[in-house]
Amino acid sequence: LYLSYGNIVILLNLSMNDLKNNFIEFAIKEKLLRFGDFTLKSGRNSPYYFNTGLCNSGSKLRSLADFYANYIHQNELNFDFIFGPAYKGITLASSISLQLDNVFSIDKPFSSNRKEEKTHGDVGTLIGSPLSGKGLIVDDVISSGSSIKESINIIKKNNAEPISILVALDRMELGKSKSATSEIESENGIKVHSIINIDDVVDYLEKKEKDSDCFLRMKKYLDEFQR
């Protein structure tokens, strides 16, 4: 379901189910989504790991941005600017902005934060467009939600409004009382969108590898930690 023009890969008019399955296959092929034994930042052991930082070439990054752009277009997300938290969000915001314009003629400014404030030249804590109006926050994955919460605060401090959040993968894991997604939505009144969530991955594995050790470990893990 890819439409190719030379080396350019564009996704057009896919159903959401097709978009999800194509994204999972892309993520596995490019090793953004890996299965094995991993230790997360939280210290929790996980049978899978997701990292869009491995989209480290023009073609891979373009393909990744196409999935975000298609999701935005299909779900008619309305916003005035795109904000990507440092560091991975910097390339995400810029590439998504580029592909929205290339594929759908939707031209939106983008911005990111600096980890440290710049005190000379282009001073301040922001890179890119000034924040004005309603913002879409883009990131690769939502686990604890810490970078998303920081982004919400940055946008509000700049007198703009965070209106929506879009991540590639929602891990849907239980925190202290509920998932990070539920916490962000209930505390801020902001909808969290994801191209896929971990249930989509498990459903995909069940169809492809129902009796595999990978599927069984994933199912056991989610039964313990998912909300």
Question: What residue ranges belong to the model's regions?
Answer:
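Active-site-proximal mixed secondary-structure blocks
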Residues: 143
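PRPP-associated nucleotide enzymes
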Residues: 1-138, 146-227
